[in-house]
Curated annotation (Swiss-Prot):
Any one cellular-component term (Gene Ontology): photosystem II
Keywords annotated in UniProt: Membrane, Photosynthesis, Photosystem II, Reaction center, Thylakoid, Transmembrane, Transmembrane helix
Protein name stated in the entry: Photosystem II reaction center protein M
Organism: Prochlorococcus marinus (strain SARG / CCMP1375 / SS120)
InterPro entries, per the entry: PSII_PsbM (IPR007826), PSII_PsbM_sf (IPR037269)
Gene it is expressed from: psbM
NCBIfam families assigned: PRK14094.1 (NF010694), PS_II_psbM (TIGR03038)
Amino acid sequence: METTNFGFIISLLFVGIPTIFLVGLYISTSDGEKSSFFSDSSKGKLGPKS
């Protein structure tokens, strides 16, 4: 029972985290913030070492 529950949580996280990331990326794209995000990252604004 615990092993099945643990496996269910792992699979839920494995599917849920990328889904949340894609939804957030889609929302930012709909708001038109995706292009500004990539332009900022290419300038090294978000990553000081890059």
